[in-house]
């Protein structure tokens, strides 16, 4: 049995990545592709690399075009999902790759996004640890009909730090994360600061001082993992790589814990995870190791002189950071094998 699929916003980077992954999924069948500005165009004109869809045509993004499918993936700008979703059947599985339904706290939404607050949906990070109820988020995704996919930066920081927060081996009040990110995370819209002539041979920090919209979501996740207040300083740095995130996150080592205790916390958290892997001691990931895959690689160290735990996490922002997470969560919701249709291995060189 196959499930019929519509992808809204299929002309963008996230939408295109959804199509690439879904092309090899044995149980999810793409029937409808929607777009805004590209409606009426052939897919080959927008995504020439997706030859299996070359002759398909984008249609307008309306609730009418999306209705009647078993699964709808939304790859739309924030603020665009709520109105469309309200018109879709409650029994349709809707997976939103945008920010509209990630935050639980309405005040945080108002402060960082603004506009109408659409409310939180079940959160699409299966590996997210839960301190109070125990277990992981995957048990809370089974059978749901609405899923909010995490932000890509949020995923990288959460996967890097949550085992330590959960085990209490790091101080939650002193978390610092600096992320090297590629421009594809900002979408496909033309912007001067994302032009090749602006970013090649350079690097630039942005949203400095806790102003990035992913900040409250990072805090929300780490507080879910630890059960208490978390203070996090997050700074992204735009670097000249098309895709990928390398997240270097540090936190103060909690009193009374050893290097062995720290490593044991990460080993316990990820021992059975299909897509998150703790690297051997002294080994740290490159972004190229995970390109094209739904895998997250985590390196771990202790800065003895500074008394801090350091994690380095690499993900592909378009796969594990967006489209792969969407499909992984949809698989769970539909009762399919979690890893079905998702690449584990990266592409090299």
Swiss-Prot record:
Q: Name one GO cellular component term.
A: cytoplasm
Catalytic residue positions: 152
- Source organism, top-level taxon: Bacteria
Its main localization is cytoplasm
Q: Which Gene3D superfamilies match?
A: Dihydrodipicolinate Reductase, domain 2, NAD(P)-binding Rossmann-like Domain
Tell me which UniProt keywords the record has, alphabetically: Amino-acid biosynthesis, Arginine biosynthesis, Cytoplasm, NADP, Oxidoreductase
Could you tell me one molecular function GO term of this UniProt entry? NAD binding
User: Which pathway does this chain act in?
Assistant: Amino-acid biosynthesis; L-arginine biosynthesis; N(2)-acetyl-L-ornithine from L-glutamate: step 3/4
Biological process terms in GO annotation:
L-arginine biosynthetic process
Q: Where in the cell is it found?
A: Cytoplasm
Q: What is its EC number?
A: 1.2.1.38
Catalytic activity field: N-acetyl-L-glutamate 5-semialdehyde + phosphate + NADP(+) = N-acetyl-L-glutamyl 5-phosphate + NADPH + H(+)
The function of this protein is: Catalyzes the NADPH-dependent reduction of N-acetyl-5-glutamyl phosphate to yield N-acetyl-L-glutamate 5-semialdehyde.
UniProt xrefs under NCBIfam families: argC
Please give the family membership noted in the entry.
Belongs to the NAGSA dehydrogenase family. Type 1 subfamily.
What protein is this chain from? N-acetyl-gamma-glutamyl-phosphate reductase
Species of provenance: Clavibacter sepedonicus
Mind giving the lineage of the organism this protein is from?
Answer: Bacteria, Bacillati, Actinomycetota, Actinomycetes, Micrococcales
| Gene designation per UniProt | argC
